[in-house]
UniProtKB/Swiss-Prot annotation:
Record's keyword annotation contains Oxidoreductase: yes
Outcome of substituting R166E: Loses the ability to bind NADPH and FAD
Encoding gene, per UniProt annotation: pobA
Enzyme class, broadest EC rank: oxidoreductase
Result of changing R269K: No significant changes in affinity for p-OHB are observed. However, the affinity for NADPH decreases slightly
Effect of substituting H162S: No significant changes in affinity for p-OHB are observed. However, the affinity for NADPH decreases strongly
Entry protein name: p-hydroxybenzoate hydroxylase
Protein source organism: Pseudomonas fluorescens
Quaternary structure and partners: Homodimer.
Listed Pfam families: FAD_binding_3
């Protein structure tokens, strides 16, 4: 097999890159370890920045998102008996976010890829990357017991935190930055109307809570829990009781409860690896960085990586400017670190940390009061929440 760009991973970042490249006439093949149903079964993020919405539109996969996505012009933070709304649209110069589940984004991209006849190899086992620093890299993998080879010009590693792509870079070439948080999020998905038409983030003495949504009829709620908690110890009733205890009384009264479709506990971490490229291999999304979900940045950072890599590959193929690809990591990391900072900050001011003393607790409350009581502070949160601009590729 031969292609121009080999893409490892058929999650949203790999599929989005493949769709953009296909529209530009650049041949690509995606290799995915799992089945399509497994990929679609992952319950993930649902808040899309303006930049990602624009990129999906550019890729021609925005029809269902435009119809079913919920445009949010604000977000609310509750703390110390107060509720503060952040007017995202006004404070960011007209930008908004769109609530549209990652599963739906993935389904739209899968259907678009199938419709255009581009190649995706599912259940590709034992994937290995070779000759990354040479001019002719290639990928080997097994399918139905047969060992196959895929020759290519470039490889995009879009296979997530545990994927083979980052592992294919010599460890001594990479610098790892990491922070693991001492709690997780217990999330519940239910076919109940959302308690609010905008997201509510709550800082409460019992711990953080978030009221989110996937659609006008499907809600997603989270509560902060210790890492020692097990999801099987949480009945639906226990979850709803705990969630109500952490929300403002008037919100808790309106909360519609119901049976859970899914419950899971996700640990929180911040993680960045530098550089994000090695020879002709380029890492994108979770393969290179993880953010705690508090800032809704994980999927959106993957999209900005994909946008950067796509535009650099266009320059390489259309203008013969392959040397620009050497800038990929530096361009991506400038935006990534700002999103990492925002996600860390949101996590720090909204969660209750074990062993926090009275002074630190009062500082946390004052930090929220200052930012949410100041036009400049509100604008800073809004600018980051809707997403910082993508860097232009000259």
């Amino acid at each position: 097999m031969k292609t121009q760009v080999a893409i490892i991973g058929a999650g949203p970042s790999g599929l989005l890159l493949g769709q953009l490249l296909h529209k530009a006439g650049i041949d690509n093949v995606i290799l995915e370890r799992q089945t399509p149903d497994y990929v679609l079964g992952r319950i993930r993020a649902g808040v899309l920045e303006q930049g990602m919405v624009d990129l999906l539109r550019e890729a021609g996969v925005d029809r269902r998102m435009a119809r079913d996505g919920l445009v949010h012009e604000g977000v609310e933070i509750a703390f110390a008996g107060q509720r503060r709304r952040i007017d995202l649209k006004r404070l960011s110069g007209g930008k908004t976010v769109t609530v549209y589940g990652q599963t739906e984004v993935t389904r739209d991209l899968m259907e678009a890829r199938e419709a255009c006849g581009a190649t995706t190899v599912y259940q590709a086992a034992e994937v290995r990357l070779h000759d990354l620093q040479g001019e002719r890299p290639y990928v080997t993998f097994e399918r139905d017991g047969e060992r196959l080879r895929l020759d290519c010009d470039y490889i995009a590693g879009c296979d997530g935190f545990h994927g083979i792509s980052r592992q294919s870079i010599p460890a001594e070439r990479l610098k790892v930055f990491e922070r693991v948080y001492p709690f997780g999020w217990l999330g519940l998905l239910a076919d109940t109307p959302p308690v609010s038409h905008e997201l509510i983030y709550a800082n409460h003495p019992r711990g953080f809570a978030l009221c989110s949504q996937r659609s006008a009829t499907r809600s997603r709620y989270y509560v902060q829990v210790p890492l020692t908690e097990k999801v099987e110890d949480w009945s639906d009733e226990r979850f709803w009781t705990e969630l109500k205890a952490r929300l403002p009384a008037e919100v808790a009264e309106k909360l519609v409860t119901g049976p859970s479709l899914e419950k899971s506990i996700a640990p929180l971490r911040s993680f960045v690896v530098e550089p994000m490229q090695h020879g002709r291999l380029f890492l994108a999304g979770d393969a290179a960085h993880i953010v705690p979900p508090t800032g809704a940045k994980g999927l959106n950072l993957a999209a900005s990586d994909v946008s950067t890599l796509y535009r650099l590959l266009l320059k390489a193929y259309r203008e013969g400017r392959g040397e620009l690809l050497e800038r990929y990591s530096a361009i991506c990391l400038r935006r990534i670190w700002k999103a990492e900072r925002f996600s860390w900050w949101m996590t720090s001011v909204l969660h209750r940390f074990p062993d926090t003393d009275a002074f630190s607790q009062r500082i946390q409350q004052t930090e929220l009061e200052y930012y949410l009581g100041s036009e400049a502070g509100l604008a800073t949160i809004a600018e980051n929440y809707v997403g910082l601009p993508y860097e232009e590729i000259e």
